Amino acid sequence: RTVASNVYKRAPFRFRTFPATGTDCSFVILNDIHGRADDMTELCREINFGKHDFVMLNGDMSNSIENEEQLFRDFIDASVNLYASETPILYNRGNHETRGVFADRLHDYFPTRSGRHYQLCKVGSVCFLLLDCGEDKPDTDIEYGGLADYDAYRREECEWLRRAVASETFRNASARVVFLHIPLDGGTWHGSNHLRNLFLPILNEAGINIMFSGHTHRYGFHPANDEVRFPVVVNGNQSYIRCDMTGDRIAIRIVGLR
């Protein structure tokens, strides 16, 4: 005798690994959610994530990281419900993710091959640099309690960046895209100045096609000029960026709640 009942079932999750060749690539960028998971869900409800190679979380998804439960509540649970079961996440740390008693554990949830928060990755023949901004204030600021050393950290990252852009993988890429949470737009805060002084001379000589940033909570576009030799797109905290790269064309669409 066979006994059966209605049981839960669904198709297995599927995902695509990044292609080894090809110049076409499509992705979505979110940043500065600051724990507003409901807002992120509403913002993304019209996106067909299955059409994109990955979702870039470009910093400040949380205000600070105090425990695992908060990390999931802030954005991970919503990301899984929206797309992350089948569409890969690339995570780029912002200045707020350096804060909180659980901040050192962030890498456990978004590991990289390099073991660092910054990395170089490749989708087809397109190279992506994910650069870690560190904190935006001086290491001596009272809120860090003498525990921060981001100036030394950025200097170490700078030496890695110098090697990364000199690599054959990067030099032979069909396009070169940079993600950096704090934009290199001439801001007066210590972190922005330090990033600009260290990274900009290297990036200006690296053939960068475009940089994507956040941090300011408002949209901005900075065309290439004599100081920054590549365009910079700054996404706000109430919008997402859709980027479609095809051959020698980069098409960007910014969609916001308001």
What name fits each language-model region?
Residues 24, 52, 86, 172-175, ...:
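A general structural motif
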Residues 23-101:
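Conserved, compact domain cores that house catalytic/ligand-binding motifs in diverse enzymes
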Residues 144-146, 150, 168-210:
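Active-site-proximal segments of metal-dependent phosphoesterases and phosphodiesterases across multiple
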Residues 28-32, 54-60, 87-95, 177-181, ...:
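Active-site neighborhood of phospho(di)ester-bond hydrolases with catalytic His/Asp-centered motifs
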